[in-house]
Amino acid sequence: MPDIIWVFPPQAEAEEDCHSDTVRADDDEENESPAETDLQAQLQMFRAQWMFELAPGVSSSNLENRPCRAARGSLQKTSADTKGKQEQAKEEKARELFLKAVEEEQNGALYEAIKFYRRAMQLVPDIEFKITYTRSPDGDGVGNSYIEDNDDDSKMADLLSYFQQQLTFQESVLKLCQPELESSQIHISVLPMEVLMYIFRWVVSSDLDLRSLEQLSLVCRGFYICARDPEIWRLACLKVWGRSCIKLVPYTSWREMFLERPRVRFDGVYISKTTYIRQGEQSLDGFYRAWHQVEYYRYIRFFPDGHVMMLTTPEEPQSIVPRLRTRNTRTDAILLGHYRLSQDTDNQTKVFAVITKKKEEKPLDYKYRYFRRVPVQEADQSFHVGLQLCSSGHQRFNKLIWIHHSCHITYKSTGETAVSAFEIDKMYTPLFFARVRSYTAFSERPL
């Protein structure tokens, strides 16, 4: 076996080699590329994470679940935003369908309205309570504007003064309106103010058709000013309440008094329907019992001059209402009389009327005049009616509730009066007002 000889360098040479390696490493670090710097940064991050895992109280499961939880949280947030947008879109669609159903119902298309109602409630069951809408004053603008504008309300309060300021003066004569198009005919603006106001009194007429006056005020600014003339509204109030409305307090204007103070309405008729069941005649068959359903109507029509008409009949309103336009009706069973309004201390307005059957002059019967031995005792029969005036729903002063009904018979020979009071039970159903356009179709006399 050959001998192995180990040769070791001297100690000084070894130290010199180590020093040269260190200097070479420092030079290499100074000359590192960006890729190597990134690698070193990743290595440092790995070492820090490794040291954190070795720390007590930290498990590998927590470290594995941390990125999963972050990803799950971001997904849940995204899904929640998407769900919220879907709910909002669904509610908007349900609101649109519900408003469409309201419009169809107002137009009389009930089947179409039910279809839209069903679709809206399938999307959002409580959509009816999530819609904030208000009616216009005349109740015809359904489906158009559902949110009130307070700024417009404040402007409407000063509309009269605003229109008065906008009027122009030409040749020292007040021009209420201007022709829109040039014409060779005489325009209504040429008429004097007094003549125009007289025409407006014909529009109101003796029937107190203030509804037509309000519609006339929508033509132009000048007509609006004429329709707000205090004298017209004062005459209307005097015709309704007489001497009891001399003072304007607590109202600010005659127009406000006419609109707010309780009164009966003249442009229609109050109608009630009563239904009951009674037993019929007995038949030979013991297993059959006849029952009859009885229906009849009551009609009450008031006039501005204090007259009133009342009719009880089984005929339906379609055939009776046209006959009640004037007091000169040919219906035999009609009762005519007078009424008055009474406002008690309890702030309840009541209507009291005394009505009698229409008197008819019968020709004398000469056939059996010599055979009559006992003279017929002549008597006058009248009915006293008491009603309480109320408001129901969106309409004002459209309901009459029975509070009194009695029959008074006065014998002419003795002057005695027999009174029979009727019990107010469920057979006396309330009367509700129904406006009739034909009652104010034309005017007979001015206000």
Swiss-Prot record:
PROSITE patterns: FBOX. CDD domains: F-box_FBXO9. Residues 26-35 have a biased composition (Acidic residues). Gene3D superfamilies: 1.20.1280.50. The keyword Cytoplasm applies. One of its GO terms (cellular component) is SCF ubiquitin ligase complex. Its main location: cytoplasm. Keywords: Cytoplasm, Phosphoprotein, TPR repeat, Ubl conjugation pathway. Part of the SCF (SKP1-CUL1-F-box) E3 ubiquitin-protein ligase complex SCF(FBXO9) composed of CUL1, SKP1, RBX1 and FBXO9. Interacts with TTI1 and TELO2; when TTI1 and TELO2 are phosphorylated by CK2. This is F-box only protein 9.
